[in-house]
From Swiss-Prot:
One of its GO terms (molecular function) is flavin adenine dinucleotide binding. This is tRNA uridine 5-carboxymethylaminomethyl modification enzyme MnmG. FAD binds at residues 13-18. NAD(+) binds at residues 273-287. GO terms for biological process: tRNA methylation; tRNA wobble uridine modification. One of its GO terms (cellular component) is cytosol.
């Protein structure tokens, strides 16, 4: 049966990637269908109840700057907020929030239900309709056919999902949900490179059986941060603490004695797990010299008694999980509500994608999220937004757009995936970005909101707030440049009290603010020097831009040099064997990766600057030098 209505964009999967993809396409005016196996689980947090962190918080701010839902949802559902690296420079500061699972999911579902141009339908997708290497729609499990020229697959861990608890295993997309077997088989028929990855989750614990007095309490920050550029602290629900405890030698002995019962060490699991979120059994083996490992005891919600013990993800048998948990301080009498488990699933080599996240082999088909080898809600949400946006642009007959590495962390993420691929679940860190000083959390809106408005992603309310903020920044920058202090000024004593050496000549507030010992708020607290503006986010931008002006200019110069050839296109059917001077090894790597641009080619392991020069010379001789949009 063919559904009576044609769509512009179909999104398959309602997790963090799928919801952002569907919302983005709908905001751009596309008639959009979100297809999910269960409408009740839209926006569900399948693993840890938290959003943000180092690198991840930057992605959330970028999603927000482009009009996405994640930041506003966590502002409404966050029960503890912290700024990580707060004592370090602004480039690596990151926001993290503990979430109430129910409140977060409700916020996402409300956003979906109120979005114009978006319809939701509950059915699993079993097949893709592909004609002449072009996707034209999908087929559901009951044979219902939906038509659309753009399809975005955001299927998480559901493709061929296999859940492991000890040496027992069963098919599942996550605990309590069936896997997607038919779609996994269909995708394996298409010309994509496919492999398996693994992720895991810890057992959940009943808070009523835990002795918190034996643990270290961890409170949130005051004042409470917000994630969204449109957010305010009053959006937050009640704030509650987390707790910290540790494993010990008894815990480690239990694990070592039972490693033979682990599916990872028993050879049952073949998929590679996340390097930066290893299971507790993996930690004990890899870090055998450590006598304890930290566990963050995280509440799952204001109305839930379940706890998430972050740090003891495991797939050991349930009886061993009980021993592990009850060996830990504070958990001696703990009751496990849900067992921990590992899940293996299919992912597809992201080098088979264009930077738009459209597949290279099937026109109009886009992938986003864990299907591309990433791990994490934030990585998924960022990809989903870009894929949904580019799926919409495809329908509109417009050029795709993906931010460059110097424009956004999502640009770094997508460039890494599509250029280098991944052999393990990919997680974002600030260390992955070359231009961290420019890619801060605090300026994500300045970097991306204008482009989002141009693309149709940013609504009038956000656009007005952005313009008001930019006006404050411009006026305050001019004010501190035009306000001068001389050594006979009435408040000179107050100014000198802030300085390491007294002022001996006239200086503007801008010059004073560039001194490392001077903070903007301290300077503004002096009578007669304070600003008329109250927008703290805007005033923070004034301080950062003034203090780091020299570094920012130098980094921008580096970017401008890099961009000379970054966007130079390598033709789709380019024959690298015809380029004289390229080694067989370089040719093989270029053929395997099929980079879209010179910039991508330069980041492939083993591709030397000399090889890049040879490519540029050849392109120039052949009259093929041109830049992408």
């Amino acid at each position: 049966m063919i559904f009576h209505e044609n769509f512009d964009v179909i999104v398959v999967g309602g997790g963090h990637a799928g919801t952002e993809a569907a919302l983005a396409a709908a905001r751009m005016g596309m008639n959009t269908l979100l297809l999910t196996h269960n409408m009740d689980t839209l926006g569900q947090m399948s693993c840890n109840p938290a959003i943000g962190g180092i690198g991840k918080g930057h992605l959330v701010k970028e999603i927000d700057a482009l009009g996405g839902a994640m930041a506003q949802a966590i502002d409404k559902g966050g029960i503890q907020f912290r700024t990580l690296n707060s004592s370090k420079g602004p480039a690596v500061r990151a926001t993290r929030a503990q979430a109430d699972r129910a409140l977060y999911k409700a916020a996402i579902q409300t956003t979906l239900q109120n979005q114009d141009n978006l319809k939701i339908f509950q059915q699993s997708c079993d097949d893709l309709i592909v004609e002449n290497d072009r996707v034209t729609g999908v087929v559901t499990q009951m044979g219902l056919r939906f038509s659309a020229p753009s399809v975005v697959l955001t299927v998480g861990t559901f493709l061929g999902g296999q859940i492991h608890i000890g040496l027992e295993n069963f098919k599942g997309g996550r605990a309590g949900d069936p896997p997607s077997i038919a779609l996994a088989d269909r995708l394996r028929e298409l010309p994509f490179r496919v492999d398996r990855l693994k992720t895991g989750t810890p057992p959940r614990i009943d808070a009523r059986t835990v002795d918190f007095s034996k643990m270290q309490e961890q409170a949130g920050d005051t004042p409470i941060p917000v994630f969204s550029f449109m957010g305010k602290p009053s959006d937050h629900p009640q704030q509650i603490p987390c707790y910290i405890t540790f494993t010990n030698e008894k815990t480690h002995d239990v694990i070592r004695k039972n490693l033979h019962r682990s599916p990872m060490y028993g050879g049952v699991i073949e998929g590679i797990g996340p390097r930066y979120c290893p299971s507790i059994e993996d930690k004990i083996v890899r870090f055998a010299d450590k006598d304890k490992h930290q566990i963050f005891v995280e509440p799952e919600g204001l109305t839930s008694y379940e706890l998430y013990p972050n740090g003891i993800s495991t797939s050991l048998p349930f009886d061993v999980q009980i021993e592990i948990v009850q060996s830990i301080t504070g958990f001696e009498n703990a009751h496990i509500c849900r067992p921990g488990y590992a899940i293996e699933y299919d992912f597809f080599d992201p080098r088979d994608l264009k930077r738009s996240l459209e597949t290279k082999f099937i026109d109009g088909l886009f992938f986003a999220g864990q299907i591309n080898g990433t791990t994490g809600y934030e990585e998924a949400g960022a990809q989903g937004l870009i894929a949904g946006m580019n799926a919409a642009l495809k329908v509109q007959g417009k050029e795709s757009w993906t931010p460059r590495r110097d424009e956004a962390y999502v640009g770094v993420l997508i460039d890494d995936l599509t250029t280098l691929g991944t052999k393990e679940p990919y997680r974002m860190f600030t260390s992955r970005a070359e231009y961290r000083l420019l890619l801060r959390e605090d300026n994500a809106d300045i970097r991306l909101t204008e482009k989002g408005r141009e693309l149709g992603l940013v609504n009038d309310e956000r656009w007005q707030a952005y313009n008001e903020k930019m006006e404050v920044i411009a006026k305050e920058k001019q004010r501190i440049k035009d306000t001068w202090i001389h050594k006979d000024h009435t408040m000179i004593d107050q100014v000198n009290a802030l300085l390491k050496t007294p002022l001996t000549r006239e200086a503007s507030l801008e010059e004073l603010l560039r001194r490392p010992e001077i903070r903007y708020n301290d300077l503004m607290a002096i009578d007669g020097l304070g600003s008329e503006f109250t927008n703290q986010a805007a005033l923070e931008q004034v301080e950062i831009h003034t203090k780091y002006a020299g570094y920012i200019v130098r980094q921008q110069d580096e970017i401008n040099k890099q961009l000379r050839h970054e966007q130079t296109i390598l033709p789709k059917e380019f024959d690298y064997k015809t380029v004289s001077g390229l080694s067989n090894e370089v040719v093989a790597k270029l053929i395997d990766a099929r980079p879209d641009t010179i910039g991508q080619a330069s980041r492939i392991s083993g591709i030397t600057p000399a090889a890049i020069s040879l490519l540029l010379v050849y392109l120039k001789k052949q009259g093929l030098l041109r830049k992408s949009a």
